[in-house]
Amino acid sequence: LKNLIRTVLRSSWFQRAVGFLAASFLRLVWRTNRFTFDPADVYEIVEPQMPAIFAFWHGQHFLTPFIKTKDIHRVKVLISRHRDGEFNALAAERLRIGTIRGSGDHGSAFQRKGGVGAFKEMVHALDQGYNVALTADVPKRSRIAGLGIIMLARESGRTIMPLAMATSRYWRLKNWDRTTINLPFGRGALVGGEMIKVPPDASSEMMEELRARLEATLNEVTDRAYAQVGRPQGPRQGMGQGIGHG
């Protein structure tokens, strides 16, 4: 029975079905939540900097495809090669978002999980005029920004835009990144923080300073997003507190 379940989970038809259902559910969430934008002119602020690097926290990224509100907002999103990532990739493609497969990690795992190839592909995508969206923290180190995204900004010359999207209704899982599954029929907020530019000759000390600034900014915009939907510090409270109600 275990082998049968494993075969089904890995089958292309099952993964496509899950991707379709996930995309349909996310559309429902986006269309049935009353979204506000902070600042109100966030797109007018960031558009002159496009193509840009959109930074989110792990576990707070399910609505990332909807940062694209115009055709000029071409976006590719970084998604891991893990089996769970396959579902996310298929859902993103259903939502007409390009994908780059690979993930950030530590030490040799960076090579094994396709980090080097993904880094080069992200630089190329930015050169081709695509915005790139990715999580700033790497697996098992929730809410700690890695240097990878800072290196991407230095290499590409593009600006980092820290973003957070929250809904008043959600499920929060008991895992390392406190994954938040956004739910329909509530309020939503998209919050942008102060943009970060990395000079091409940035020293290691400056890189660390900018990494810490990105981390602080992402925490700030995430807190603001949840406060605006009436769920102050929703994802940063104790894990596993169930559903948030709008």
Labelled PLM ranges:
Residues 61, 139-141, 168:
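Solvent-exposed loop/turn segments at secondary-structure junctions
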Residues 57-61, 81-84, 185:
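Short glycine-enriched loops at secondary-structure junctions
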Residues 78, 102, 135, 162-165:
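Generic beta-sheet signal
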Residues 115-156:
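Catalytic-site beta-strand/loop segments enriched in glycine and acidic/polar residues
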Residues 80-127:
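Conserved nucleotide-cofactor-binding alpha/beta core module
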Residues 1-68, 72-74, 90, 96-98, ...:
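Membrane-anchoring hydrophobic helices of lipid-metabolizing enzymes
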Residues 144-204:
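A cross-family acyltransferase "interaction/gating" segment
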